[in-house]
């Protein structure tokens, strides 16, 4: 009895000592323990997502991949799998598992091994939020105290939800939602039992056990998890047998991008990082909605790439990427055996080689395995065997120079050989020999009413070059400058009916010691010509004469109204021919002024920003070209209503925290801000109408006086509300096409990144038929096709707009030869628009011509000729 009494006393003393020890340890560590109340308002590090205006995902930015989910959004089987392997008694214990702790203590006492785990899910949550993963006794004790605090603060479901969203699961994925996407490209509800088991097994060692890093390790750990799931009756034996027999197949998956706009994504990323800093931009879960329309964006990319492929094919085939083995063409009667092959690779070796090749856009690496008279066989990555028919090969004459190509091939033997690594792409469901285009291009479309960017593609491939040619490439614009020159002329006394002299200019430049002879392209001169017709036909010498008549200072002042920087505008007569260097975005913004009635809008791409919870943090309020609307003029905006996107965003981020949503009253109080009117509505209408003549031409074909404008191919769109202009620079180094309707302004540029390289000339190709495009590259031949392809998809959503003549313009019938009034109503006359007071006062007679000549006398010199645009 006495020993029982002693044992009870000893036990009581040990309990008291234990309580005192625990209390002492707690008070000793208390000051070092984090404040767990922060878990009540925890903000998970979630990547920034960028969307199109219609909600398609463009990109995701962030160090940590996370897809936060509510507990009720997770499949029960996934939750039960984690509980089975990590914490079976989770809903029963107070945050610590006493049985597990005793087991760990026993192992430590007997072997000194600290690797034995006893952490509950609550303890793991405490460690993930507040502590390191080091296996030290002090850290473990802190973990226990924190777990108890957390259990008092949060419900079990709240703890489990935080854990399943916070836990590190390898490959920079955090939480089950991200792991399902990263490893399997699925949502959590699409996971199979074996995939659930793989994910549930990752917390133990996410780096070593993830299926991308080691399929064998992942399989072994998966089987352990499946065993626990069977043991705890989460799954039955049939499900267990099926899951344990499944192979481990996994690869890295990115975010489910549904809209391709990498140049836009990068613009947004840079903007957000500049304003928020990297940590907030990449981890606050911001949802950025852009102005991009996904369907238009997809067509813009297709139009740009297809146009570059077409240009590339016109100029010839540069040969294979590589030759894996030598094949020598020999003469033989059997066309199947015309190559003698030296040490060809086996099928396995070919596939191993192809697996190492990276894809470029829609180009697929392939190895030629056999060549026939007018076809070739190839194998592409993945082992698919394909046949290249003659239609996909016949274009491939050899490249000689940018100006010359080889003869048209007659057989496939002249094009490819077995063992060659080539690039293929699919076009019209047929495989086609291809190559990475060397030329570059850019396309941008904006809403002229407010500057919203609807489509933007800054180059052939963002993965190849992150240089955004829409916003960064300043290139000479050629004849795309002429509408702005003509606009200045209309401000200084000229009309669309003014007669100009379309005749060669020969002027001696005493400073340069050479003669300046600007030429038309083509070198056709019509003599007396109306301003409307000269613009539509893109007459170079008329543009020079208009600049002389208006004056270079007046021209530059006028061009600055369109947002062009003075330093980009040469202060000499070459300005009239397009020596100014502008980006495509600057140029299309200028054209938007003609489309919207004379207002200068500011291009923007960020429409709104939502918090991770979907609350509106920012709504862009653009300046708008709005005639007759209840608006606030830009120059009268207060500090609370900044006049541009930059100021608006700066103000937002200075006054709002990420937790402060805008309310509906905030949005309602954002009145429409009117853009600055930089030219009159009458001026913009006259230029836009004259540019319609560039599309539809004029005169009477029936009477032999008909003529085409340089943009006549746009007629295929069958719309009368399109205004358009071509542009080509010296030696075809830059080609442009810009056009607009009242609802959409679009500019396309094509050229080489090397500004000194010409786009050259494509010779006639005997294999390609009558529909081919041969000749010197130009705006109409090289840039217009991409513009047309894009517009065929984009325009149908914008109804055709009737021409609304501005107040103040009059329409009178003029004689087409002299620009004077006429009483005739036949093919020799037409109605023309005039600003008040500029209408002709005389009637045309046989002997009257209203011709405006430049004052400088042509000096007939034989000095060196300078070819201009």
Residue ranges and their predicted role:
Residues 91-101, 174-177, 236-241, 490-510, ...:
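Short, well-structured active-site flanking segments
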Residues 82-83, 229, 300, 373, ...:
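Active-site SXXK
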Residues 110-135, 189, 256-260, 449, ...:
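Conserved catalytic neighborhood of penicillin-recognizing serine enzymes
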Residues 22, 113-379, 546, 560-561, ...:
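Non-catalytic, structured segments within soluble enzyme domains
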Residues 67-72, 403-413, 436-441, 464-484, ...:
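Short active-site loop at a secondary-structure junction
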Residues 1-51, 89, 108-109:
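N-terminal type II signal-anchor transmembrane helix
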Residues 514-519, 551-589:
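Mid-domain, small-residue-enriched loop/turn segments at the edges of structured enzyme/sensor domains
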Residues 78, 290, 294-297, 301-303, ...:
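A penicillin-recognizing enzyme superfamily signal
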């Amino acid at each position: 009895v006495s020993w029982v009494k002693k044992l009870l006393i000893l036990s009581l003393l040990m309990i008291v000592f234990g309580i005192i020890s625990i209390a002492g340890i707690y008070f000793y560590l208390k000051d070092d323990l984090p404040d767990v109340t922060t878990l009540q308002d925890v903000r998970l590090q979630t990547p920034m997502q960028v969307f199109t205006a219609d909600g398609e995902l463009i990109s995701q930015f962030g160090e940590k991949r996370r897809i936060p989910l509510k507990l009720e959004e997770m499949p029960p089987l996934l939750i039960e799998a984690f509980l089975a392997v990590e914490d079976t008694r989770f809903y029963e214990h107070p945050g610590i598992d006493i049985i597990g702790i005793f087991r760990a203590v026993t192992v430590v006492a007997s072997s000194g091994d600290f690797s034995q785990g006893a952490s509950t899910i609550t303890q793991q949550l405490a460690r993930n939020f507040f502590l390191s993963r080091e296996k030290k006794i002090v850290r473990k004790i802190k973990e226990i105290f924190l777990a108890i605090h957390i259990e008092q603060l949060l419900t079990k479901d709240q703890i489990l939800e935080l854990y399943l969203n916070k836990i590190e699961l390898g490959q920079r994925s955090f939480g089950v939602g991200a792991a399902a996407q990263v490893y399997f490209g699925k949502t959590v509800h699409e996971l199979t039992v074996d995939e659930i088991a793989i994910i549930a097994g990752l917390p133990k060692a996410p780096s070593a056990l993830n299926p991308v890093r080691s399929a064998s390790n992942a399989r072994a750990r998966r089987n352990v998890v499946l065993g626990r799931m069977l043991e705890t009756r989460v799954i039955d034996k049939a499900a267990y047998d099926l899951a344990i027999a499944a192979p481990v197949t996994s690869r890295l998956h990115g975010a489910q991008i549904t809209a391709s706009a990498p140049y836009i994504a990068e613009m947004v990323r840079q903007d957000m990082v500049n304003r928020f800093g990297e940590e907030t931009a990449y981890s606050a879960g911001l949802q950025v909605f852009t102005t991009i329309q996904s369907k238009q964006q997809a067509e813009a990319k297709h139009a740009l790439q297809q146009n570059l492929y077409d240009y590339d094919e016109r100029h010839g085939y540069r040969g294979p990427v590589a030759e894996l083995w030598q094949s020598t063409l020999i003469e033989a009667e059997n066309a199947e055996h015309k190559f003698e092959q030296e040490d060809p690779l086996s099928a396995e070796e070919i596939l191993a080689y192809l697996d190492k090749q990276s894809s470029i856009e829609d180009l697929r690496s392939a190895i030629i395995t056999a060549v026939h008279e007018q076809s070739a066989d190839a194998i592409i990555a993945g082992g698919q065997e394909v046949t290249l028919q003659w239609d996909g090969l016949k274009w491939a004459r050899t490249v000689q120079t940018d100006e010359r190509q080889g003869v048209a091939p007659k057989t496939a033997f002249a094009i490819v050989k077995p063992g060659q690594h080539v690039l293929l792409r699919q076009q019209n469901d047929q495989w086609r020999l291809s190559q990475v285009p060397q030329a570059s291009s850019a396309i941008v479309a904006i809403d002229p009413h407010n500057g919203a960017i609807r489509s933007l593609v800054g180059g052939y491939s963002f993965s190849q070059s992150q240089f955004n040619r829409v916003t960064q490439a300043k290139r000479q614009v050629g004849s795309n400058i002429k509408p702005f020159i003509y606009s200045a002329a209309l401000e200084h006394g000229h009309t669309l009916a003014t007669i100009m002299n379309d005749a060669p200019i020969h002027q001696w430049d005493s400073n340069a010691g050479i003669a300046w002879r600007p030429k038309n392209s083509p070198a056709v001169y019509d003599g007396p010509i109306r301003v409307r017709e000269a613009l539509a036909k893109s007459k170079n010498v008329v543009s020079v004469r208009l600049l002389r008549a208006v004056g270079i200072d007046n021209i530059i002042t006028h061009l600055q109204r369109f947002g062009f920087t003075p330093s980009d505008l040469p202060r000499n007569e070459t300005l009239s021919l397009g020596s100014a260097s502008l980006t495509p975005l600057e140029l299309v913004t200028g054209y938007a002024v003609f489309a919207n009635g004379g207002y200068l809008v500011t291009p923007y791409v960020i429409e709104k920003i939502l918090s991770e919870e979907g609350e509106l943090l920012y709504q862009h309020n653009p300046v708008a070209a709005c005639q007759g609307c209840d608006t606030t003029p830009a120059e009268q905006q207060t500090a609370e209503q900044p006049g541009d996107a930059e100021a608006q965003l700066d103000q937002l981020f200075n006054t709002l925290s990420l937790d402060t949503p805008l309310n509906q009253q905030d949005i309602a109080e954002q009145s429409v801000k009117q853009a600055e009117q930089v030219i009159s509505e009458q001026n913009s209408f006259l230029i836009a109408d004259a540019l319609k003549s560039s599309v539809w031409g004029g005169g009477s074909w029936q009477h032999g006086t008909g003529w085409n404008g340089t943009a006549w191919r746009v007629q295929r769109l069958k719309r009368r509300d399109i205004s358009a202009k071509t542009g080509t620079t010296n030696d075809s180094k830059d080609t442009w096409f810009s056009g607009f309707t009242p609802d959409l302004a679009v500019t396309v540029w094509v050229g080489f990144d090397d500004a000194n390289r010409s786009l050259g000339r494509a010779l006639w190709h005997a294999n390609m038929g009558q529909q081919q495009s041969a000749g010197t590259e130009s705006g109409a031949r090289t840039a217009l096709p991409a513009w047309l392809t894009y517009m065929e998809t984009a325009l149908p959503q914008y109804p055709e707009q009737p021409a609304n003549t501005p107040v103040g313009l009059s329409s009178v019938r003029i004689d087409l030869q002299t620009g004077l009034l006429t009483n005739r109503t036949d093919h020799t006359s037409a109605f023309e628009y005039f600003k008040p007071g500029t209408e002709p006062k005389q009637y045309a007679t046989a002997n009257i011509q209203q011709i405006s000549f430049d004052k400088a006398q042509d000096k007939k010199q034989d000095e060196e000729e300078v070819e201009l645009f």
